[in-house]
């Protein structure tokens, strides 16, 4: 089994419902088990700032799927929940990013792991580190909390405390 960390985000319509449905669908993936989910945080939009605030969270899973197959599954979940890829950093019903896939490193057109922007985004690192405070970034094994310490966290607020139902 491979431990996988995901970031989930949404800023359209019933944001909390999209996160919940994404978690439920992730928990039902073949050869995959949802291990933990973070609290939900509300954050200002990143990249393209003239849009609604996001809800963001992280989750931890273990899977026997390959990284490529796992990516296909997450993209299918996004599509089933109405995700339309029309604008970079635009509004979305759900965004599921693979942050870490075990200790593996991928740099292909389709898949970049560790996620290339995760160390620049407090809205990713805060929920991720809630799940695993001592997490390190492969391949350099620098603590992710050290990246977070250098980031502005002022626009991130707790929306809903951690839940364990899955």
From Swiss-Prot:
Pfam families: HPPK. It is an enzyme of class 2 (transferase). Its EC number is 2.7.6.3. One of its GO terms (biological process) is folic acid biosynthetic process. Pathway: Cofactor biosynthesis; tetrahydrofolate biosynthesis; 2-amino-4-hydroxy-6-hydroxymethyl-7,8-dihydropteridine diphosphate from 7,8-dihydroneopterin triphosphate: step 4/4. InterPro entries: Hppk (IPR000550), Hppk_sf (IPR035907). The keyword Kinase applies. Keywords: ATP-binding, Folate biosynthesis, Kinase, Nucleotide-binding, Transferase. Signal peptide: none annotated. One of its GO terms (molecular function) is 2-amino-4-hydroxy-6-hydroxymethyldihydropteridine diphosphokinase activity. It comes from the Bacteria. It catalyses: 6-hydroxymethyl-7,8-dihydropterin + ATP = (7,8-dihydropterin-6-yl)methyl diphosphate + AMP + H(+). Catalyzes the transfer of pyrophosphate from adenosine triphosphate (ATP) to 6-hydroxymethyl-7,8-dihydropterin, an enzymatic step in folate biosynthesis pathway. Belongs to the HPPK family. PANTHER family: 2-AMINO-4-HYDROXY-6-HYDROXYMETHYLDIHYDROPTERIDINE PYROPHOSPHOKINASE. This is 2-amino-4-hydroxy-6-hydroxymethyldihydropteridine pyrophosphokinase.
């Amino acid at each position: 089994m491979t431990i996988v960390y995901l970031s989930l985000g949404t800023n359209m319509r019933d944001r909390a419902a999209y996160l919940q449905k994404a978690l439920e669908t992730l928990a039902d993936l073949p050869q995959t088990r949802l291990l933990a989910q973070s609290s939900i945080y509300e954050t200002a939009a990143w990249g393209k700032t003239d849009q609604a605030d996001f809800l963001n969270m992280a989750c931890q899973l273990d899977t026997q799927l390959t990284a490529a197959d796992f990516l296909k599954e997450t993209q299918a979940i996004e599509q089933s929940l109405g995700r339309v890829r029309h604008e970079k950093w635009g509004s979305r019903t759900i965004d599921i990013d693979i942050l870490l896939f075990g200790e593996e490193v991928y740099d292909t057109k389709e898949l970049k792991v560790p996620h290339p922007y995760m160390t620049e985004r407090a809205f990713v690192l805060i929920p991720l580190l809630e799940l695993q405070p001592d997490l390190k970034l492969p391949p350099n094994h620098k603590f992710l909390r050290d990246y977070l310490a250098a980031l502005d966290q002022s626009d991130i607020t707790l929306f809903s405390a951690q839940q364990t139902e899955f």
